[in-house]
Amino acid sequence: MDTRPIGVFDSGLGGLTAVRQLRRVLPGEDIVYFGDTGRVPYGSRGRDIIVQYARQDIRFLLQQDVKFIIAACGTVSSTYPPEEAARLPVPFTGVVGATARAAVDATRNRKIGIIGTAATVRSGSYAAIIRDMMPDVQIFARACPMFVPLVENGYFNDGNPVTKLIIAEYLQELKDAGVDTLILGCTHYPLLKKMIGDFMGDEVHLVDSGKVTAQAAAAALDELGLLNGKKTGGTARYFVSDTPDNFDELAHTFLGEYAGGTVERIAIETY
């Protein structure tokens, strides 16, 4: 039994979709969340900058005495060196491994689509893991750099004409290719899931990286003996790197409920 909190971070607020799922499967666990809202998005930046930001995010969470760290960010998960993750003093997981496995389990025609930030797609991390498990798979990857800004700025309401147009622009090629499974390779993308599903069609299975990762993290915490033993009453503390004004309203969108915890701005560059 371990009463320390779970640490979760993302480039912005998208990682709250993973927190939402984590609270569903582990309602008694305490959570510390950091959203780097002052430097979002990470996906358009170079590898060295992404790794630098990830190191700062991780150092901050370690100072909060967390017992387990979840990089609820496809860009970091695809870029942060695994050898560094292995040297951290607490277990670390990203979103790529569990999500890739879920896609392999779901596909019927062995045609898998991957959408994510430019950095995530460029890394080839999803494709490499999927091909290890399913060598004869056909993979169709597409960077969707506008999706994170659209979500962070509230353009995710069902039927928004601007968002629908951009979804069609990005995903038509994958639809034409006949993918039957599509990885939502960024934790912001579940906010667009309804519109993406409407465009791709009911026959295409959408793999939510935040949901899959939360389930995998819960299993890992249990296996490692790190759960706190509580069934209810988990608390949450939220930290951001930009002004926290209207955080509760924005967080409600990602969590499906009001945050119900404290939110504090920090100077992440000092970590």
Stretches found by the model and what they are:
Residues 1-271:
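Non-catalytic structural scaffold of enzyme domains
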